[in-house]
């Protein structure tokens, strides 16, 4: 699975990259909104981890632009904005999931696995 991380906080972006690589994901990281939109528009990613508050272009604008372009890559918003209204706005903008900072690594990895199962039409045995 190839994941794009769009996060301007370098320490967090680097930590996410390391964690994801340790879990056998291929990862690209970008730190600015316009770069994130360019990378995400390539269509080569299986998942995008997207911050909302980014320099140059905010994450919601990136998300809405991707959806307008019919790019359906799953997106998990990772953001400090944790009000219910923020979550609703993010999901209504086209996000597949929303995780407020700070978050646990285990929860993030579980959400990635859940989205991966859905996108692969996973049918687990009971």
Segments predicted by a language model, with ranges:
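N-terminal/domain-start alpha-helical segments
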Residues: 1-122
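Short acidic-hydrophobic surface loop/beta-edge motif
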Residues: 124-126
């Amino acid at each position: 699975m190839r994941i794009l991380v769009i996060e301007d906080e370098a320490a967090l972006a680097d930590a996410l990259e390391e964690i994801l690589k340790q879990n056998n994901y291929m990862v690209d990281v970008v730190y600015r909104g316009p770069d994130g939109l360019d990378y995400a528009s390539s269509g080569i990613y299986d998942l995008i981890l997207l911050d909302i508050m980014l320099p140059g272009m905010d994450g919601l604008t990136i998300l809405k632009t991707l959806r307008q372009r019919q790019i359906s890559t799953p997106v998990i918003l990772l953001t400090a904005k944790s009000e219910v209204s923020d979550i609703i706005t993010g999901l209504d903008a086209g996000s597949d999931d929303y995780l407020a900072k700070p978050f646990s690594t285990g929860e993030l990895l579980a959400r990635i696995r859940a989205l991966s199962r859905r996108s692969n039409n996973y049918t687990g045995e009971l």
